[in-house]
Amino acid sequence: MSYLVLARKYRPRNFSEMVGQDHVVQALSNALTTQRLHHAYLFTGTRGVGKTTVSRILAKSLNCQGADGQGGITATPCGVCQACTDIDSGRFVDYTELDAASNRGVDEVQALLEQAVYKPVQGRFKVFMIDEVHMLTNTAFNAMLKTLEEPPDYLKFVLATTDPQKVPVTVLSRCLQFNLRPMAPETIREHLVQVLGQESVDSDPQSLRLLARAARGSMRDALSLTDQAIAFGAGALTEATVRTMLGSVDRSYVFRLIEALALGDGRTVVQTVDTLRLNGLNAASTLEEMSTVLQRMAVLQTMGSAAADGDDDSDAEAADTARLAALLPADETQLLYSICLHGRGDLGLAPDEYAALTMVLLRLLAFKPTGSGTTQMGAAPLAEKKL
């Protein structure tokens, strides 16, 4: 039997299995329960947050026949009737998915709309799902406007896009819009714990935190990375194997760099960059991790201990962040954060990314406000020399 990747194996089959999109689930469930159904829905959000999944669950809810064949429109599709199983397997003739990224012309849209005049063959409703709808041409959008505004009673449109700003306002005004949010790292981590428990895969908490951060709000990306990590770690997930696979920088290096900058210790800064080079760790990832830590330090300096609520850091990382927040003045934290952000853009312009990283960090040191009368190398500041 062929292996089924985790992202497909654990794709939600009903609204109760959806993770991190409670606002969308509640709105659609209430609409289905009261049968106040719109004729066109637009789901927006970044990749891997559930737009296509919600579309399929909605199609099942509209066409579910019930386990006994006597069911109607429901917010809890049975999952076992002919309509539900056919939609799950992609065989339901009344549910059509069109990928607008590869079928973006007016001819493809007109071919789809020609089917709108025919009543459903198997279910109660025809459902036309157009994915990445923002990729359609202007002519294609214009061709579908009339049908989108006044479709037959048996037809529902579901549009999905990662870039709603590119969808014409004439289309937006005809749709009921739902924004699927990027998922918090803690939400992703909790779901990975459940998935790995069902897969009987051993893991440690820090490895899951790394995967959740790397997913950047996308559950599909998190499951794909988990698949890769299981293969890389020979069936087990540890912090070391996941960090190596992702090429991410150990926070201990980041804390060492920020502490050295706070103390004006240029020698430690250069030595730490040399260590990063020897270990093959990415310079851009180093600045990204530094920006993340500096942002959390700034929030701690403003809000105190209450700022830790909702962070996905381990206890040790949170303690180090708090220690550095107390060590570095708030204005210097802001300066370091700003230079780190701008420094990431400099990396691609330099012949050697580690040399560029060194220069960015030394720039942080050079522009660091100081009340001392000497620089790191013991020379008098320029202003004093002029005097």
Where would I find each of the regions flagged by the language model?
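P-loop/Walker A NTP-binding region and its immediately flanking N-terminal helices
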Residues: 1-177
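Short, intrinsically disordered, charge-balanced linker/junction segments flanking boundaries
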Residues: 76, 382-387
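Extended, largely alpha-helical regulatory/partner-binding modules appended to the mid-to-C-terminal parts
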Residues: 82-93, 108-114, 124, 150, ...
